[in-house]
Amino acid sequence: MFENTKKALETFRTAIECVKCKKPRGDLQYLGSSCKHAYCWECIATFQQKPSGKRSSVARHMCPSCAFPLDTSKITEAHMLKTCFDTLSELNDLLQKVGTTSLTQAEFACTQNIFNKEKTPADAVEKFLETQAHMPDEMGQLGEEDDDLMCKDENRENSNSPELDIFHDYSKEASPTRNSTKRPSTVSVHERKPKRSSILKTSVKNEPAAPVVDLFASQVPQRTHQNDLLTPFIERRSTAPAATGVATYAQAFGSSSNPVKAEIIEEDIFSKAIPLTKRQASMSASAKKQPKLEPEEPEEVPSTSRSRKNSIKSDKIERRSQSPMSFGEKSMSVKSEQRRSSYGTRRGEAVLVNSIRNNRIPQLRSAVEAGTCVNEKEDGKTPLYVAVENSSLEAVKILVEAGAVINASCGSTLETTLHEAVRRQNTQIVEYLLSKGASIKIRNIAGKTVEEMAKSDPKIRKIIEKFKTEQRVLQPVVAPPKSRLHFVQLIDEKMLTESEKRKLPGKINIVPADMDSPTHVVVTVDLKTRVLNINKEHIGEILKAIIKSGMIVSRDWLRACIIDPSKVDDDRSYMVQKVRWMEGEVFENTIEQWKKTITKMQPKLFAGCKFFIPKPKYNFLDRPALFEIIRSAGGQAAAREPIIDEKDPPPYHNANLKPNFVLYSLTHDIGDKFRDCTKYNLVSEQWLIEAILGCSITTPPH
C-alpha cells in the first residue's frame, strides 16, 4: 500500500542534497549571498580549513555548480530546505507505520471507475463549443457561408434583456439560454458592433456616426424592460449624510422630506435608498433637529460653492464638537477594558499626562473610566508622579483609586511620589499618600529616605511620625491581568514537531525568536531535579527572558495543553524555579524575584551602573546583546571610554562599589588606568551572568 507514494517521497527527499558531496541532508546551509546552493556542515568544515603551502589564511572558494564565490563567514540556515526535509521524513515515518493491507475488490473497482471518468473526455471539446457564441471571421465581418447564422443573430438581437442571465444553471445537464422575455430591436445585423477579433475592423465612409456618450449620464439602460433578475447595472448613489446638499437619495428609510421623490424611489427598483451607517444616520438626525431660521419652501436650492475655502469652513463647523475636550468626555467612555496604549492628543502626549498638566480633570476622569493604563510611564515618570509634580490633589485621588502604583520609582533619581510630595512640601498630598499605603523606607538614587528629606520641615515630619507609629498596610501591588492570547517563544525550535505545533490550542501562538516581548518563553528542564541547565548557545536568549516581564515555563506546559486545552491558564504551575549555568551554583527563586521587581516598578538590578564594553565580542555574548541585556536590567552601556564624575552616586543595590564598570576578557588587554579600583570596577563576563542569575551585585574579585 502507498508504494508509489513512498517512491515519490524518497525521490523528493534524496533531491534535497548537498551540492558538493551529493548526500541528502536536512541541516543544509547557505554560504554568503551570491551562491544559492546549499552545503552540509562536513563540506563547510573543509572550506574553512587553512590551505597548505600558502601564506594567506583566507582561501577563496567557488561553488562547483554555479562558480559563484562562497563566503564562509556568513553562514545562514536553509530554512525552506530543512522544513521540506523534516516534513518528508515525518511523512515517511507515518507511511512506514501504516499496515500493508491490500485493497478489496470493491475498493479497487471504485478507484478504477474514478480514473476511467477522468480518461474519457472525448466530447469535452464539443460541449465547450456548444456553450460559445458564433464568432465572426478574422476581419470581424460575416462570411458568405454564414447566411444561416443571420437569423440566429436577429433572434439574439431581439432579446429583451441587454445582458446574459448570469444566474442560470451552467451544469452539464443545462444548456446555455438567454432570457425568455423579448424586446423589439432597432439595430440591424450589419450595424451591430462586431465582437473582439485579432484584427481591427476597417472603418466605412458611409457608416453613420456613433452616438455621443454622456460620461455623466445614469448607468441604468435607457430602454426599459421587465426583468425580474438582478442586473449589474445599478445606479450609483452617494453615501453622504442628508445634512449636506449632495446626498438627496442617501437618506435613512422613512426619512424622505419630499413625497414626490419618495414615491419615485418606491416605484423604481434601480433607485432604492441606500441604508446609512450608524454615524451617518445620527448626523442626519441631529441635522434635522436643528431649528431652521426660515420656513421650508419648495424653492430651488441655491448651488453651493465647492471651493477649498468653503469646504474647510464647513468641515470646521461640522467637526467642532470633536475637539480633544469633547473627545475625552464622550468618546472615551465606550470601551471599558484597560488598554496599554493611551490616547494621543495634538501635542503628541499621553492623554493622562496631557490632562494633568493642563488641569483637565473631566478629561482625566473620562480617560480613566475608559480603561487607559494608569501606570504607563512617559519620560520615565508615571501619571501619578506628574500629578504630584503639578500639586493636583484631585488628579492624585482619581489615579490612586484607579490602581496607580504609589511606590513606583520614577525618573533618573529613582524617587517615589512621596519623595516628590515631600520636596514640594505639599502636606495634603503627603497625608493622602501615606493613608493609601505609601512606603517610608524606600530610598532614592542618593540613598535618602522620606524621613531624611523632611528633617527641615516640621509639619511634614509630624505627619510622617503620626503614620509611622500607627499599624498600617502598604499598598498591595496587583499583578497585571493575563493576556487573552499567549505569544510563546521556543528556545529550541526542535522542542516540538510540526504535528505537535498544529495540535496546540488557539490561544497559544508560536512566535519567532526576534519578537521583543513574548508572554512565555519555553525551555527544557531536567526531569528529576527540575533545574534549567543553560548552555552556551542559549545564554543570551535566557538572560533576556529573565530580566523581562515574560514568564519562563517548561516544555511540559505545552505538552499538557495538547492533551488538555484547559491547562493553558495553569501556566504558573510550570514556571521555572531553579537555574544553573555551566554546571555551577544552582540559583533558586531568583527568576520570580525579577518578575516581582518589574510588577512593583522598583529599581532594577543595574540601576546606577555604567558599563564600558571595549571589546566587540566576548566568549559567550557579543556587544549588541550585552547592550540590550544591561539596558533592560536598568543600567547604562557604552562602547566609548566613560567620563569619570565624582558626583555620580554609587549603584542602587550596592553602595560600596563605584558606578563605573569595565567588562574585560582574558584574551583582551585592558589599559592600566582601568585597573584603578578607586575609579573602576573590573568585571568579567562570568560575573555579569552570575549577577543576573542571582539577582544581586557582589563585589568583583579584582
From Swiss-Prot:
Autoubiquitinated. Phosphorylation of CeBCD complexes is required for E3 ubiquitin-protein ligase activity. Residues 601-702 form the BRCT domain. It is found in: Cytoplasm; Nucleus; Chromosome. Residues 153-205, 281-346 are annotated as: Disordered. E3 ubiquitin-protein ligase activity of CeBCD complexes occurs at DNA damage sites. Following DNA damage, E3 ubiquitin-protein ligase activity is reduced by caffeine treatment (inhibitor of ATM and ATK kinase activity). Residues 174-188 have a biased composition (Polar residues). Pathway: Protein modification; protein ubiquitination. It catalyses: S-ubiquitinyl-[E2 ubiquitin-conjugating enzyme]-L-cysteine + [acceptor protein]-L-lysine = [E2 ubiquitin-conjugating enzyme]-L-cysteine + N(6)-ubiquitinyl-[acceptor protein]-L-lysine. Keywords: ANK repeat, Chromosome, Cytoplasm, DNA damage, DNA repair, Metal-binding, Nucleus, Phosphoprotein, Repeat, Transferase, Ubl conjugation, Ubl conjugation pathway, Zinc, Zinc-finger. A zinc finger (RING-type) spans 18-67. GO terms for biological process: DNA damage response; DNA repair; positive regulation of double-strand break repair via homologous recombination; protein K6-linked ubiquitination; protein ubiquitination. The keyword Lipid metabolism does not apply. Its main location: cytoplasm. InterPro entries: Ankyrin_repeat-containing, Ankyrin_rpt, Ankyrin_rpt-contain_sf, BRCT_dom, BRCT_dom_sf, Znf_RING, Znf_RING/FYVE/PHD, Znf_RING_CS. Residues 312-321 have a biased composition (Basic and acidic residues). Disruption phenotype: DNA damage repair defects following ionizing radiation with reduced ubiquitination at DNA damage sites. RNAi-mediated knockdown results in elevated levels of chromosome non-disjunction that manifest as a high incidence of males, impaired progeny survival and chromosome fragmentation after irradiation and elevated levels of p53-dependent germ cell death before and after irradiation. Absence of S-phase checkpoint function. Signal peptide: none annotated. ANK repeats lie at residues 347-376, 379-408, 413-442. One of its GO terms (molecular function) is ubiquitin protein ligase activity. Constituent of the CeBCD complex that possesses E3 ubiquitin-protein ligase activity. When bound to chromatin, the brc-1-brd-1 heterodimer within the CeBCD complex is inactive during normal conditions, but in response to DNA damage, the brc-1-brd-1 heterodimer associates with other proteins such as the recombinase rad-51 or the E2-ubiquitin-conjugating enzyme let-70, which activate the CeBCD complex as an E3-ubiquitin ligase. This is BRCA1-associated RING domain protein 1. The lineage of its organism: Eukaryota, Metazoa, Ecdysozoa, Nematoda, Chromadorea. The gene is brd-1.
